Structure formats: structure tokens, C-alpha cells
């Protein structure tokens, strides 16, 4: 368990000791594992053992993250995917996996390895082979991509950038509150990895959508998401639905990229829980 944080190890040990089916939650860029806490409480009450997985070197709190933003720099999709596989590898039971944004991409990578009992990908970042690139997504990622040096940096969004890419479907007051409560810096590198994936034969954003052991998969798409517009989630679904496992798409009207943390989080969480209950 050398690569697993003390916080993750504590949750893994509790899951193994209790014998309940684990649910591994994977956050994406600009959030921490703690952003899943309300989801974790809901799944815990439903009889599951939540594991709030972290990206390598993640600080414990938003305050710590803001005090040391450079700790996020340089993390890659491959590193994080392998880390999640390490976390799952020390669980006694095959878990369900829930991920958002780049966490949703990584959740699909994990599922493609055959180590997830059921997978939920909420507005997932595109994996290699997902071709649509809407203008809204280009604008949402511009704070990173406009400077090639951001490949090796951690990038913090301004409130206006967060409002456009994440919180465009909520009112300005809620957008401000979400930024203050949840937003932290994020590595720029995963954005660049996704941007050039279709030109890179060895792209770390690849997903094995054909593996018959992938298991059931639910993909969410928020109608108003600027960071991952519906065209991208729909394209991921079309590639995944050829898998022999159950593959479903949940369309969420009037929802943006903040749908797992904003005031409407419970609707998404309840649908995710219903799906997981069917298979894990």
C-alpha cells in the first residue's frame, strides 16, 4: 500500500473489515476527494462502504490545497489511473466506481481493466477516440491550453472562469459559494493529454471499451455543461454501448459541470445509487 495515502488506507481497511461492497469515488480536476462527502454519506446509509480516492499527493483540505497549489502540478491521467487500480487492488471485494469529469474518464479506464463491479461516469472527460470538440469545451479549457507552459504547472481558475466552465447552470450567488467551498488548483497536463489523444498512439487517456469484463456502465450528461458538453458524453456512450455489458445514458436537463456538488447533487447521486444497487 506504498502508493496509497493514509486517508485512503483507513477507508480501505474499514471497507475490508466491514464486509460491505465498496464504492470508490474519483474526483476530477479542480476538486478534492472531500467534494464527494455528501455522496459518501448517502452511499454509506444505503449499505455501501465509501472510499474517497485521491490523486497522488492530494492535500487533505481545500485550505491546504490553496496554501500549496504547486503540489498538483505534473500529474498525468496514467499515473492517476494506476493509482486508482492500486486502491482497488487492496479491497477485498470488487467495488463500484463513481467518477466525475477526469474522474469519470479514469473510472472508465478502471472499468476497462475489469476491476469494477459497476461504473458511473458523470460528465466524463473524453477518452481517446471521442471526437467531438465543441466550442464551449474549447473555451472552458482555455485557461489551461492558452499557455503551453501550463503542461507542467498547476492552474487555478478565476471565479469568472469557474462560472463559465463549471457553474453556468446555477445562479451567480451559488456559483460564488461553490468556488469558495470547493475550488482548488489542478494540473494542466491532463487537459493537454486529452487534447492530443487522438493523435497519440500511446495516449494515456485510452479506455478499453471492448473488454467483456468491463461491467455495467452509466454515463451522465448535463445539458448545459460547458466543460464536457453533451456531444462529448454522447460520443463516449456510443463507443461504450458496443460492449456486451449494460451501458446506459442519463441525460440531465438544465445541469452544468457542477452537478455533483451544486444544490442539485442529490438527483444525480440518487440515480447513481439506483444504478449501483442493480449490479453491486
What name fits each language-model region?
Residues 2, 246-280:
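Catalytic active-site module of serine/aspartate enzymes centered on a nucleophile-bearing elbow/loop
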Residues 16-64:
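Short, surface-exposed "cap/lid" segments of acyl-processing enzymes
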Residues 28-31, 101, 223-224:
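Active-site glycine-rich loops that stabilize anionic/oxyanionic intermediates
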Residues 78-95:
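Conserved acidic catalytic loop of the alpha/beta-hydrolase fold
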Residues 98-103, 107:
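Gly/Ala-rich beta-loop-alpha elbow adjacent to hydrolase catalytic centers
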Residues 116-152, 192-199:
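Flexible "cap/lid" loop of the alpha/beta hydrolase fold
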Residues 213, 219-221, 225:
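Short beta-strand/loop motif that positions the catalytic acidic residue
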Residues 226-235:
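Conserved alpha/beta-hydrolase "acid-adjacent" motif
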Amino acid at each position: 500500500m506504498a502508493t496509497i495515502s493514509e486517508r485512503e488506507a483507513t477507508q480501505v481497511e474499514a471497507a475490508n473489515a466491514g464486509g460491505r461492497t465498496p464504492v470508490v469515488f474519483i474526483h476530477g480536476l479542480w476538486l478534492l476527494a472531500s467534494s464527494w462527502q455528501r455522496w459518501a454519506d448517502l452511499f454509506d446509509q444505503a449499505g455501501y462502504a465509501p472510499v474517497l480516492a485521491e490523486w497522488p499527493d492530494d492535500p487533505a483540505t481545500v485550505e491546504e490545497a490553496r496554501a500549496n497549489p504547486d503540489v498538483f502540478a505534473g500529474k498525468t491521467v496514467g499515473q492517476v489511473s494506476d493509482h486508482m487500480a492500486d486502491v482497488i487492488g487492496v479491497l477485498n471485494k470488487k467495488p463500484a466506481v463513481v467518477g466525475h469529469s477526469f474522474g469519470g474518464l479514469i473510472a472508465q479506464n478502471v472499468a476497462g481493466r475489469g476491476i469494477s463491479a459497476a461504473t458511473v461516469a458523470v460528465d466524463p472527460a473524453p477518452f481517446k477516440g471521442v471526437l467531438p470538440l465543441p466550442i464551449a469545451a474549447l473555451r472552458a479549457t482555455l485557461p489551461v491550453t492558452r499557455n503551453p507552459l501550463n503542461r507542467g504547472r498547476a492552474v487555478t481558475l478565476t471565479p469568472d472562469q469557474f462560472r463559465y466552465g463549471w457553474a453556468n447552470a446555477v445562479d451567480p450567488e451559488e456559483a460564488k459559494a461553490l468556488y469558495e467551498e470547493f475550488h482548488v488548483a489542478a494540473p494542466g497536463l491532463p487537459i493537454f493529454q486529452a487534447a492530443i489523444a487522438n493523435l497519440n498512439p500511446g495516449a494515456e487517456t485510452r479506455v478499453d471499451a471492448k473488454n467483456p469484463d468491463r461491467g455495467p456502465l452509466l454515463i451522465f450528461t448535463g445539458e448545459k455543461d460547458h466543460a464536457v458538453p453533451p456531444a462529448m458524453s454522447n460520443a463516449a456512450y456510443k463507443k461504450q454501448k458496443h460492449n456486451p455489458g449494460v451501458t446506459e445514458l442519463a441525460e440531465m436537463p438544465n445541469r452544468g459541470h457542477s452537478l455533483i456538488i451544486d444544490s442539485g447533487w442529490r438527483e444525480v447521486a440518487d440515480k447513481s445509487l439506483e444504478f449501483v444497487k442493480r449490479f453491486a
